[in-house]
Curated annotation (Swiss-Prot):
Pathway: Quinol/quinone metabolism; 1,4-dihydroxy-2-naphthoate biosynthesis; 1,4-dihydroxy-2-naphthoate from chorismate: step 2/7; Cofactor biosynthesis; phylloquinone biosynthesis. Coiled coil: none annotated. Binds 1 thiamine pyrophosphate per subunit. It comes from Prochlorococcus marinus (strain MIT 9301). This is 2-succinyl-5-enolpyruvyl-6-hydroxy-3-cyclohexene-1-carboxylate synthase. It catalyses: isochorismate + 2-oxoglutarate + H(+) = 5-enolpyruvoyl-6-hydroxy-2-succinyl-cyclohex-3-ene-1-carboxylate + CO2.
Length: 587
């Protein structure tokens, strides 16, 4: 009986992982543990066969975010394997972000069998409930143990997973009860592998392709209020679709712009291509300067709202029609509750629209007068920024946002951490992110997992530049414990402002300095050079933009993980930036 259970545990683990690979899993993050041993051993064998990449991580929290970074950069499913108990609870932060940013991640967790539940057995908790509030589905094999699970049950579980991910991308929790014995002898492993290779490895499985059918009535309802002959603006927020669909998204956007002639406001992580006609540079500053003068009757919003108070205020006060198009995101996505929401994506919307119009070259429109005016306003602000932001000046966060896209090679990807960087880049980067893939995890917009996310992205797209503040970086310092993380082609631009600089903009004026530091800034005296050395990561500190350019060239050439630190004086930052903004608004 012992031999039977251990063989069945191993065989079913092989079958489950093999099927998950067939629906798109290419990369697997493995966390330590005993209860998950059959899954780990099976993963190791499939790795030997060249079927899946395995990277280990001793911290489940980092593993979850690392897997999410891989999914975002590749457009493919990624997988995390953990043991039971508190290990599962550590996956929640990454599951929350995967849910809100609509990225496919599978959390495969080992559990105790039913006979050990609710009786005080060690390391036995209600882990099947831990991720349920944010996962598309929580599925399980036979509750008595994986060894009692039938082949068709595993196939059905994977089919449900594939259907859920295809319909509404996001996290899936597969909770797998496994009974002892967890190990398997060399002889039994050899015999089971022979059976698996002979019967299951090359077996063909049918996974029903999910076709997402649009609601033509919903389109017609929206098209009645969508007037191509009236002036409007296209607002493109953070891109939530798959990176594999980015080309078709941009083609649809190009077609939409051609038949409207409307101006386009693009978020730094919108995925919009830099050569799109109608792009308005410095659009947030244009909004701030002319908030009451921009007149049009309709707005076409793509994806979630950008992190801009100026944009939010503009949308709240806007009295015309707002249409919001979402990419496979079926939840409400409009916090100001003023838009007509369309769930089926820009490609679908544009295809039906062009079909209704019988589109041809004659339908193309010149840029509208509003577009020409906004583009000119953006260029005037660009001239001011060019005069004011001089490369030899002292480094500040807003200057980094403006100059780093020019210093980092235009074809190389960038990741922006949450908090200050994404906001500064939205205001000052002048569409500099649109020449490349630019990532920022704006689903839940937390600073969690910053380093692990970047390491995940850099496995797929590199050399990658991560722009992060000191607190966001050190919050996820365990990311360096992910396998071969120091060998990734990742450059970290560490903005050291000795605490949460974003709070200087919000709470400082109403608190005493010591209160402000303790309650919000939370500064940490960290020796960054020694910290880097302890993880065997190369480190440089630079004090001006000339040295920063040289440091970028150095970091790309060595093809390893590198930290480049710049020090920021928050007081000087606030004073300089406010003076610059006053000059722009008053021009």
């Amino acid at each position: 009986m012992t031999s039977s259970i251990e063989c069945q545990n191993f065989l079913r683990s092989l079958q489950l992982l093999n099927l998950l690979i067939k629906i798109g899993v290419q990369n697997l993050i493995l966390c330590p543990g005993s209860r998950s041993a059959p899954l780990a051993i099976a993963a190791g064998e499939l790795n030997k066969l060249g079927m899946v990449n395995i990277f280990n991580s001793i911290d489940e929290r980092s593993a979850g975010f690392h897997s999410l970074g891989i999914s975002a950069a590749s457009g493919n499913l990624s997988l995390v394997i953990t043991t039971s108990g508190t290990a599962v609870s550590n996956l929640l932060p990454a599951a929350v972000e995967a849910d809100r940013s609509c990225k496919g991640v599978i959390f495969l967790t080992a559990d105790r069998p039913l006979r050990l539940k609710d009786c005080g057995a060690n390391q036995t908790v209600n882990q099947e409930d831990f991720l349920s509030s944010v996962c598309r589905s929580v599925l399980s094999t036979n509750l008595n143990g994986l060894h009692e699970t039938q082949e068709n049950e595993i196939l059905n579980l994977v089919r449900i997973t594939e259907k859920q991910i295809s319909t509404f991308p996001g996290p899936i929790h597969l909770n797998i009860p496994i009974d002892k014995p967890l190990d398997i002898s060399f002889l039994n492993k050899k015999n089971v592998l022979e059976v698996f290779k002979r019967i299951y490895l090359k077996k063909q499985y049918v996974f029903q392709k999910v076709e997402i059918k649009s609601d033509k009535n919903k389109f017609l309802e929206i098209s009645k209020i969508f007037n191509l002959d009236e002036s409007g603006i296209i607002l493109v927020g953070p891109y939530q679709g798959s990176v594999n669909d980015l080309s078709s998204f941009n083609k649809s956007l190009e077609q939409l712009q051609e038949i409207t002639g409307w101006p386009v406001f693009a978020d730094p992580v919108s995925g919009v291509y830099s050569d799109l006609r109608g792009l308005v540079v410095n659009w947030e500053l244009v909004l701030r300067k002319h908030k009451n003068l921009i007149k049009c009757k309709q707005l076409l919003r793509l994806g979630p709202m950008s992190s801009s108070i100026d944009l939010e205020n503009f949308l709240i006060k806007f009295e015309g029609i707002q249409i919001l198009i979402k990419e496979k995101n079926y939840r409400k996505l409009d916090p100001i509750k003023k838009s007509f929401e369309y769930d089926f994506g820009l490609l679908n919307f544009t295809s039906i629209l062009l079909e209704e119009l019988s589109f041809n070259e004659k339908n193309k429109k010149s840029l509208t007068p509003l577009a020409l005016d906004l583009i000119e306003e953006g260029k005037q602000i660009k001239d001011i920024l060019k005069d004011e932001i001089i490369i030899d000046n002292k480094i500040t966060e807003y200057k980094l946002a403006n100059l780093v896209p020019k210093l980092w090679p235009a074809e190389h990807p960038i990741m922006l951490s949450a908090s200050s960087p994404i906001r500064d880049w939205l205001t000052f980067s002048e569409n500099g992110t649109l020449t490349r893939n630019c990532f920022s995890f704006r689903g839940a917009s937390g600073i969690d997992g910053t380093l692990s996310l970047a390491l995940g992205i850099s496995r797929i797209k590199n050399p990658l530049l991560l722009v992060t503040g000191d607190l966001a970086f050190v919050h996820d310092i365990n990311g360096w414990l992910i396998e071969n993380s120091v060998d990734m082609n990742l450059t970290i631009l560490l903005i050291d402002n000795n605490g949460g600089n974003i709070f200087n903009r919000i709470y400082k004026k109403n608190l005493k300095e010591d209160e402000f530091k303790k309650l919000f800034l939370m500064p940490k005296e960290i020796n960054w050079s020694k910290l880097s050395e302890s993880y065997q990561v190369k480190f440089k500190s630079v004090s001006n933009f000339k040295k920063l350019r040289e440091a970028f060239d150095w970091s790309i050439s060595i093809q390893k993980s590198v930290i480049i630190k710049v020090d920021i004086d928050p007081e000087n930052e606030i004073y300089e930036k406010n003076a610059l903004l006053e000059k722009i608004i008053g021009s």
